[in-house]
């Protein structure tokens, strides 16, 4: 009995110390300078929430690999969209987008695939947030996975009559068990409003509902800190880590994404 009490007290002390360490890392990395070298800089260029949504989705889609390459190719992507992504989605000549490479294995045909689906969503619902409201994603325990599955349905429906070669490269065809790192990152940008990095243009979703955008850096850091035991970087790992971080900050667990990613990249 006494051993259990002592272990409980020890665990509480360890959690308190770990929370303090994580909070200090948030203070260190959740700063404007961090955003200057992060893909979030692209949706932050816009003021209209719908432009921000589109930029966030497309930028996050190509956010894998080396950071300098991501930023350079996101610039190329936004060169196609122009100064008003919403206008391009609704009125632009999607079929005129060529077969040029945009980012690694993401080519013009993959962008066309995504834009056809977005045109259907914005024509019918007016915004991605309104689409999310229509499918009740904000009431789901795992909004990212629910929204991704429904978005996938629209993407494939909108491309039924389009000649398409290869996988979509936009979202996994089966989202149920994947980490959805890039999609969760886009939701972090759209839902959180910290006045520093994230824009928080969505009102129906709450930061408490967000899940950590898990990548190799944040996963390795989380394991080193004892926050994550699962070895695979999949949905179960995202859930395990997020549930633990909710103990530290139930209203905004994704705030620790800055700490985990920054510490992992810089070896702090």
Feature map (PLM): residue ranges:
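HhH-family (HhH-GPD) DNA N-glycosylase catalytic core used in base-excision repair
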Residues: 6-268
